[in-house]
């Protein structure tokens, strides 16, 4: 959401220089960010070129079932469905060709671009009613955004393969999500040309009914929303306990990220300034957790508008 190879053969140094741009961060802890839910004054290229960030989550695939039974996208200011999408009745999909170069730019810098599915319930509908629906969505998203080969003409980003999916289910119902996660992981094995990731963004009250622990334990990392949730918010009395519970509950093989608001301007509850967040991150570091991975910010545009909030956070990671 990472790159971890060391080469010692002298003859490969020139190739390494080309493959690993100077832009790339080398800190052990990572910073992930959501992009696409606000206006696009801060472009995807801006985010990709910002050395603060290691992973970009595209927000959002907001509905699992929309026009023609296909998902609905609500990412940035795209131009509506393509001709082929309209013909198929997939009116919730978007022509994402304007983002293709930016996605490739991010990927060329070693920064995964991940499709986040869900969001707040007044904005999205990612509730499933059966395991079969979960498997269906995993296969549909695999074909439309990842390494699948069916429905090529409907792919929003053409032949570009995104790097994975993020589960942001806030419905308080995890039905079908375990089956969906397992199907995604099975599909990932079909394409050995690249690494795919599956992540989640549960709420901090532990455990989260929307993102059950049996799902979270299958993932690459979990970026817990320590905001909008009262006592377990950052700098609140229940924060440390929630962090420890999540770390233990997801298991040492799944990385834990501390999710935070990059601004208080969006009406969400629980924003803290950069100094307070950095103290909270230092508190987590001192816990010496085996799976602490870094931090997550909501959202890229909000961070820029808040004095480039992300730079202070990355500097502390």
From Swiss-Prot:
Keywords: Carbohydrate metabolism, Chitin degradation, Chitin-binding, Glycoprotein, Glycosidase, Hydrolase, Polysaccharide degradation, Secreted, Signal, Virulence. It catalyses: Random endo-hydrolysis of N-acetyl-beta-D-glucosaminide (1->4)-beta-linkages in chitin and chitodextrins. Secreted chitinase involved in the degradation of chitin, a component of the cell walls of fungi and exoskeletal elements of some animals (including worms and arthropods). Participates in the infection process and directly acts in the penetration process of the host cuticle. Involved in heat-shock adaptation. This is Endochitinase 3. One of its GO terms (biological process) is chitin catabolic process. Its EC number is 3.2.1.14. The keyword Signal applies. GO terms for cellular component: extracellular region.
């Amino acid at each position: 959401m990472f790159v971890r190879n060391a080469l010692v053969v002298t003859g490969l140094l020139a190739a390494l220089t080309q493959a690993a741009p100077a832009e790339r961060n080398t800190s052990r802890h990572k910073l992930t960010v959501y992009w696409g839910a606000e206006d696009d004054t801060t472009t995807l290229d801006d985010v990709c070129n910002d050395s603060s960030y290691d992973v970009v989550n595209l927000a959002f695939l907001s509905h699992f079932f929309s026009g023609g039974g296909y998902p609905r996208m609500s990412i940035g200011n795209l131009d509506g469905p393509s001709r082929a999408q309209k013909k198929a009745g997939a009116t919730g999909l978007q022509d994402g060709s304007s983002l293709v170069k930016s996605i490739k730019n991010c990927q060329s810098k070693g920064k995964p671009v991940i499709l986040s599915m869900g969001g707040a319930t007044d904005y999205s509908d990612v509730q499933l009613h059966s395991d079969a629906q979960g498997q269906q969505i995993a296969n549909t998203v695999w074909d439309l955004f990842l390494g699948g080969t069916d429905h090529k003409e409907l792919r929003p980003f053409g032949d570009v393969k995104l790097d994975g999916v993020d589960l942001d289910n806030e419905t308080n119902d995890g039905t079908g999500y375990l089956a969906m996660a397992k199907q995604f992981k099975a599909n990932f094995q079909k394409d050995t040309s690249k690494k795919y990731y599956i992540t989640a963004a549960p709420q901090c009250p532990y455990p989260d009914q929307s993102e059950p622990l049996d799902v979270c334990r299958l993932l690459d990392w979990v970026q817990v929303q320590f905001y909008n949730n009262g006592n377990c918010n950052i700098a609140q009395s229940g924060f440390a306990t929630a962090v420890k519970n999540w770390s233990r509950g997801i298991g040492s093989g799944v990385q834990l990220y501390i999710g935070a608001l990059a601004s208080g301007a969006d009406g969400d509850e629980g924003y803290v300034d950069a100094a307070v967040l950095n103290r909270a991150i230092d508190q987590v570091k001192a816990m010496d957790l085996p799976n602490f991975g870094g931090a997550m910010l909501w959202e890229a545009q909000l961070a820029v508008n808040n004095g480039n909030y992300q730079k202070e956070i990355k500097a502390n990671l």
